[in-house]
């Protein structure tokens, strides 16, 4: 297994698929990384040389925020919304859908499980 930006990526997968194991890199960015570093995207990770792996790792570190850095930035952005008290921040605080979805009949994932009802004895 190759290690890129502190994450072990599977060695038996193709490069453009294996790069998606990094938080913040999807299909488009993975192909872009392969193109800019000159690595064949259909090559298996175990077939890569150390030079190619280091080239990919340095390109990612120079051009993208990934893993912990990206996670902290996203958390910081959400915290900022909550601190300024805007509508989106309030929805985050209350644990409700943020992007305008209906909540009367759906949104169970965001709201969590329904509170249990107490059953009366004797009925």
Curated annotation (Swiss-Prot):
Part of the 30S ribosomal subunit. Forms a loose heterodimer with protein S19. Forms two bridges to the 50S subunit in the 70S ribosome. The keyword Chloroplast does not apply. Located at the top of the head of the 30S subunit, it contacts several helices of the 16S rRNA. In the 70S ribosome it contacts the 23S rRNA (bridge B1a) and protein L5 of the 50S subunit (bridge B1b), connecting the 2 subunits; these bridges are implicated in subunit movement. Contacts the tRNAs in the A and P-sites. One of its GO terms (molecular function) is rRNA binding. InterPro entries: Rbsml_uS13_C, Ribosomal_uS13, Ribosomal_uS13-like_H2TH, Ribosomal_uS13_bac-type, Ribosomal_uS13_CS. PANTHER family: 30S RIBOSOMAL PROTEIN S13/40S RIBOSOMAL PROTEIN S18 (PTHR10871), SMALL RIBOSOMAL SUBUNIT PROTEIN US13M (PTHR10871:SF1). Belongs to the universal ribosomal protein uS13 family. This is Small ribosomal subunit protein uS13. One of its GO terms (biological process) is translation. Residues 97-123 are annotated as: Disordered. Residues 101-123 have a biased composition (Basic residues). It comes from Fervidobacterium nodosum (strain ATCC 35602 / DSM 5306 / Rt17-B1). One of its GO terms (cellular component) is small ribosomal subunit. PROSITE patterns: RIBOSOMAL_S13_1, RIBOSOMAL_S13_2. Keywords: Ribonucleoprotein, Ribosomal protein, RNA-binding, rRNA-binding, tRNA-binding.
